Amino acid sequence: MAAKDVVFGGEARARMVEGVNILANAVKVTLGPKGRNVVLERSFGAPTVTKDGVSVAKEIELKDKLQNMGAQLVKEVASKTNDIAGDGTTTATVLAQAIVREGSKYVAAGLNPMDLKRGIDKAVVALVEELKKASKATTTSKEIAQVGSISANSDESVGKIIADAMDKVGKEGVITVEDGKSLENELEVVEGMQFDRGYLSPYFINNPEKQAAILDNPFVLLFDKKISNIRDLLPTLEQVAKASRPLLIIAEDVEGEALATLVVNTIRGILKVVAVKAPGFGDRRKAMLEDIAILTGGKVIAEEVGLTLEKVTLADLGQAKRIEVGKENTTIIDGAGAAADIEARVKQIRIQIEEATSDYDREKLQERVAKLAGGVAVIKVGAATEVEMKEKKARVEDALHATRAAVEEGIVAGGGVALLRAKQAVGNLSTGNPEQDAGIKLVLKAVEAPLREIVANAGGEPSVVVNEVLNGKGNYGFNAANDTYGDMLEMGILDPTKVTRTALQNAASVASLLLTTEAMVAEAPKDESAAPAMPGGMGGMGDMGM
């Protein structure tokens, strides 16, 4: 086992605080409408230019082990805030640095760190309560657009496209962000349920222009095994032919004789049939087949529930108004399933989302909810170069998360104003314990940090602006984009309550850990000069006794 260095007390905290400052100073230059860019080196290809706090934080690894521990703890603040609220990473980092900076002065002066921590916790609880009181529900498309714009570093086009997407697919619908092909951002909306499986044979195409098979008012057969024998399918095909309606077959696979017969019948115009593979794999495939069954009002034909292909009746088949099958995707529009059944299924999946442990599972479950509930909107981000594309895409994703957070918990005045108003509301909070009161005091001072940083990045004088804002009331604040004062909500400068709350709670949590640290253990640096000399090579020809 390698030797370890153990550092105690003030020295340990001082080294950690140095690490916190290095990371926070790199991150906080991106805060506000006039935030600066940070350039990140890449091992290959062009460097990345970003104004996204969490992207900067993730890149930082310090050589000094003890400094690095401090930096990694603050990186955790940014990542955690990003995971929960999807935005507010820079605000969280600035708050954490401010609480650590103020707190370490008190600890150095001999105050008890545990009492300071209790005071910090009490102040945070009181501030969060005030933020919730000040919160206003987001109802209009305009407010949603404003939240998106602020999060995307005051880019109004991003806010507008997110608001449009939410109008189209609802606030619960899935909105994904992809690379676009043009210079402009584009919005594409997929109505109904779409899954990523296309026709099994190009002979099924009946619309050459779209290169797709379009079925109007079709039946839908859902089967969870392979179909290779046409005899199994004959009873179903006969019933569908009598009803003179098209049929979509969704099965694990359709192959051999069965596929050939379907193709021949389609070409001859005897039947209008399309076969596609079922989406997903394993258990997820079964769940998605069940989703399609509920959406179309049909049943999944599976042996475990006692259903076989030979015994299928028209009542077991799903129905839809229209189905489009392309080379890679199938879209079911206006399924005939009962609204109550669909709602019950959505509720069931939501419970699974809450219980899901991995991000991947959660994402897939959310996609299933959206496909059942509202549809999917795709925002295609346009840019001139790949470097710009990456930066823009990261901002759009941030803005999307912030907008979702605003819909969830409402909005407060942006630009650091909400925290100042909360500070004024709890200004006379006291515990009767001087050391805990010091903890409260340091948090109330630290909440000024985001506004101070926004002003500093815009080239203003932070103290002057903070005093001016504190003298105002309600949503009165400073618009750093054009150096004016006024009502923040009217100027469209809003923050989601969830983002501000999460940033404050996570910053205080990690800062408290740093302040109550009394010892640090890290691997001792290896002494390069003490390395043994390399053994000599073989002698030349003259030394070999020739």
UniProtKB/Swiss-Prot annotation:
Catalytic activity: ATP + H2O + a folded polypeptide = ADP + phosphate + an unfolded polypeptide
GO molecular function, one term: isomerase activity
Bias (Gly residues) ranges: 536-546
Source species, domain of life: Bacteria
InterPro entries: Chaperonin_Cpn60_CS, Cpn60/GroEL, Cpn60/GroEL/TCP-1, GroEL-like_apical_dom_sf, GROEL-like_equatorial_sf, TCP-1-like_intermed_sf
E.C. number: 5.6.1.7
Keyword line: ATP-binding, Chaperone, Cytoplasm, Isomerase, Nucleotide-binding
GO cellular component terms attached to this protein's record: cytoplasm
Chain segments carrying region Disordered: 527-546
Enzyme type, top EC level: isomerase
GO BP terms: protein refolding
Protein location: Cytoplasm
Protein residues bound to ATP: 30-33, 51, 87-91, 415, 479-481, 495
Disulfide bonds: none
Similarity remark: Belongs to the chaperonin (HSP60) family.
Assembly information from the UniProt record: Forms a cylinder of 14 subunits composed of two heptameric rings stacked back-to-back. Interacts with the co-chaperonin GroES.
NCBIfam families assigned to the protein according to its UniProt record, in alphabetical order: GroEL, PRK00013.1, PRK12849.1, PRK12850.1, PRK12851.1
HAMAP family per the UniProt record, alphabetical: CH60
Cited function: Together with its co-chaperonin GroES, plays an essential role in assisting protein folding. The GroEL-GroES system forms a nano-cage that allows encapsulation of the non-native substrate proteins and provides a physical environment optimized to promote and accelerate protein folding.
Name of the protein this chain belongs to: Chaperonin GroEL
